[in-house]
A protein has these predicted regions:
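Substrate/ligand-engaging "lid" and interaction regions
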Residues: 1-31, 152-171
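Generic structural signal for well-ordered, non-membrane alpha-helices
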Residues: 2-9, 33, 37, 95-98, ...
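Short amphipathic alpha-helical segments, especially helix-boundary/capping motifs
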Residues: 8-13, 42, 73-79
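Phenylalanine-focused residue identity feature
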Residues: 13-15, 44, 67, 127
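Small-residue-rich helix-loop
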Residues: 24, 28-72
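Long, low-complexity C-terminal extensions of enzymes
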Residues: 52-160, 166-167
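Long, low-complexity, intrinsically disordered segments
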Residues: 174-190
Length: 190
């Protein structure tokens, strides 16, 4: 949604304060509504993006635009991508938005805003994200039903939604599987 800003300024703008215009925020919130609907289809009552930001930053933002304009930490530095090959596009679309879309399709949801974002990202990055989608396949779930996927995700097929809180620095127990502490990145000499 900020392709013009990114290409014209090479990232020399405040990604949230300047890039999150009223229309961009509206699209972001619509995408989030579709994400929440997908979560509900699998038995989860997920936090909205604004709710998540309020919870994690102990704030009271009314909506995503309010957050983008008012968050001191997100507006401290410009921090915008310098090109359309940035991880915000490549990773967020391929590893986040496309899996949501795949899960939505399994649940019978068309998710038109999510699909539009994927299509636009494919055009500007010269990479067809949908033809390379592999999230469900990589998880061994490409042939699974919505109900089977729901059980794997720890959701329910009954009307029993639950809120997913963000993971803390403590060990997490996800679906009965113990996970260790977060992996720390290390620098490897060339």
């Amino acid at each position: 949604m900020n392709t013009g800003w990114i290409e014209s300024t090479r990232g020399d703008f405040y990604f949230y304060h300047q890039g999150m215009s009223p229309s961009v925020a509206k699209v972001s919130e619509k995408l989030d509504e579709e994400r929440l609907a997908i979560g509900r289809a699998y038995g989860f009552d997920l936090l909205s993006i604004t709710g998540y930001m309020n919870q994690n930053y102990r704030a009271q933002y009314r909506n995503y635009r309010d957050f983008a304009q008012g968050s001191p930490i997100h507006n401290k530095t410009k921090g915008a991508p310098q090109s359309m090959k940035h991880r915000y596009l490549l990773e967020d679309i391929g590893h986040c938005i496309v899996p949501w879309y795949e899960l939505g399709l399994k649940a019978g949801l068309s998710s038109p805003t999510i699909k539009a974002i994927i299509d636009l990202a494919s055009i500007v990055s010269d990479f067809d994200y949908l033809s390379h989608r592999r999230a469900l396949k990589a998880a061994g779930l490409s042939e699974a039903s919505k109900e089977e996927i729901s059980l794997v995700l720890g959701g329910t097929i009954e009307d029993d939604p639950r809120v997913l809180a963000p993971l803390s620095d403590n060990y997490a127990n996800i679906n009965g599987l113990e996970t260790g502490p977060p992996v720390k990145a290390t620098q490897v000499a060339a």
